[in-house]
Structures are given as C-alpha cells and as structure tokens.
Amino acid sequence: MSAPEPRQHNGETPEEAQAAGREILAIIGQLRQLVDGHERRSKIQPVKNSEMATDDEVTHPDRLSHLTSSYLNSANDHCRALLTLLDDGNGGLSILIVALHSHIRAIIEHAALTSWLLSPSDPHERRRRALAAISSELTFEKQLVSSINQGRPPETREQRSTRAKATRDANRRDRTRQKTLKAAAKACGIADDEYSAGLPKWSEILDDASTSSTRFRGGFLPKTIWMLTSGLTHPSASRVMLVAAMQETRDYGNGTLQVEVTARIGSLVAPLRTATSMLEDAIDWERYRKAKVAEH
C-alpha cells in the first residue's frame, strides 16, 4: 500500500502562483516608474500663488511642503528597498514570507499621511493638519531625549556634565520650536487645542486617505492591508500563516507534524497593489496642490 500524498495547507496551484507572479511583475513595473520619476518630481517647486505655496507662506518656517516632500522621499526609499528584495538577480522574483511587508507598511503609512495632509480643500484644515503632524514630531523628539536620559547613568563628572548640557540644549530647542509652532498657528487662526494633541490614530488617517482617493473610493482595503502588514511587522506565529503555504513533510504519528513553510505568492498581490495605488494618490495630491492657484 503506497504512502498517502503529503497534504498542503493554505497553498496555491502552480497556475495560481504563475498568475500571481505575472500580477506582481506588472505592479513592479509601476513601482519602478514611480521610483524613476521621483527625483524629477521632487525638484518641482510649487507655482507662485498656488495652494501649497500659500500654505507654506502662512505656516513658515513649518512648511507643509517640507513634511510632504520628506514623507514621499521616505516612501521612495522603501520602494527602492522593496524592489531590491523582490529581484532574485536572475530576472525572476524573490518572494520572502515576511520581510517585504515591513516595507509595504511603511509605503502605505507615508503615502496615507501625505494624502491626509493634502486632500482637504479647506486651507484652514490643511494647515491645522500640518501643525498637528509637526506637534507629533516634537513630542517624539522629546520622548526620545527622555528615553536616552533614562539609560545607563553617567559614571563620571564629565559624563554628567555632558548629559546635562545635552538635555538643556534639547529643552531649549523644544521651547523654541513650540514657540514657533504657536506663532504659526496664531497666524493661521488655529487654536492650540486644534493641533497640540498631534496626529489621530492610523486607522483614521487611512480611512480619510481612502475616502479622498480616486482609486479606492473609500473602500476598506487600505486599512485592512495596513492591519495585515502591521501585524506581520511584529512578532507573531499565527499571522505568518495568513501569507504562507505549508507542505507536510513528516507525520510523527502522535498528532505532531513537520511542515515546510513557504511564501504564498498570491498573498503579496493585494498589499503590493494597495501600496502602489496609495503612493500614486499621494503623488497626485502633491502635484495638484503645487499647481492649483489659491482662491483669495
């Protein structure tokens, strides 16, 4: 009597894998076009009297364009890393089970935040969101300094003096930045409590970005994909199974199986497509605000 065929779990047929591979190659082509055009796009300055130029002027020195260009630069950086990981060096695909999702998540977050900042038609709301983003960054910087100070205690008088000076300098920078932020808010007619709490939750940012999108039209997909990629960025045994295929290689006869875990190629299609579409949305919003003349 022949041994039973080893069972597959959560697998895909060769035809399904090939179809998914073709879709991934097409998305990679889109990503490469975005990466290749990034440097050219990043050098385009806002048109005089455009909405972005006007936003920058009234919030100076905390410019909205500084935030969005930084976010798109970072998204492009993750795109380049993603393309490198996907290339097996022989003209084919290299599909890692988990590592790709960390970069996909980062692209989604940078793109969503860019769209969240730029999509409101009301200039007051765009500026309020920009100040909220800056407030969040200042809070992080302060927490980082505090974390450093809670590390290994200084052992010598010189070390204590150096740390104390670094803390004073950091606090001075924070006070200066907070004062500048308040002045910008006042110039925009924005109350402190409208921005000082910082950014909303990522789920709210993603909902807003997908609602303003011409590609998703408020669909659930961006937030769902973000939740998946976030889950795969953190340690988890069960979440890996959502994107993996398992092939039984040995049955120990006591309820224990040995399995080989491989990437399920089809599970990468929706995350890649979502990240690419969200980045295209963000690029469209930046182009639009740089070109559209502000109404006075």
Regions found by a protein language model. Name each.
Residues 2-66, 138-296:
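Secondary-shell segments that build the walls of catalytic and ion/ligand-binding clefts
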Residues 97-150:
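Internal, hydrophobic cores of structured domains that mediate oligomerization or house catalytic pockets
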Residues 90, 122-123, 244, 290:
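Residue-level detector of alpha-helical recognition elements and their boundaries
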Residues 55-119:
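Long, hydrophobic/aromatic-enriched structural stretches that serve as scaffold segments
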Residues 90-94, 123-124, 128, 211-219:
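Intrinsically disordered, low-complexity coil segments
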Residues 74, 78-88, 136-143, 228-232:
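Solvent-exposed, amphipathic alpha-helical segments
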